[in-house]
Amino acid sequence: MPQRIVVVDDERSVRTGLANLLQSEGYLTDAFESAESLLGNEAAMATAALFIIDVQLKGMDGFELFIHLTRRLEKPPGIIISGNGDDSMLRYAFDLGAIAFLPKPIEIDILFEHIRQEFSSKAAPQ
């Protein structure tokens, strides 16, 4: 069964581009333009195997969204993305439990490496 990845980015081109790319690799996707729209969709949160979240969103920012997700879900795997990230943002993302912090424009090979790594670690026997 294909894994479902949720993309949250207020830039339509990034959001749809990532969703289309992920679908072309066989993943199911849900895409949201705001933190609030995702938090209002229990089904999307419950079925997500991974979250890709932009830091700068209208309304609640991506870090705050990830904090909300960690309160609702047990260790949600998240990749945080940002068009203007710095070292303090990178450290904060990892402190929150993100599996990666990627600058925009996203290097697709690196993105898929993190995704494959996350999904293979979940599939490995404990």
How would you describe each model-predicted region?
Residues 31-50:
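Acidic, metal-coordinating helix/loop segments flanking the phosphotransfer/catalytic sites
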Residues 64, 85-100:
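Alpha4 helix (beta4-alpha4-beta5 surface) of REC/receiver domains from two-component response regulators
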Residues 88, 106-116:
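C-terminal output helix
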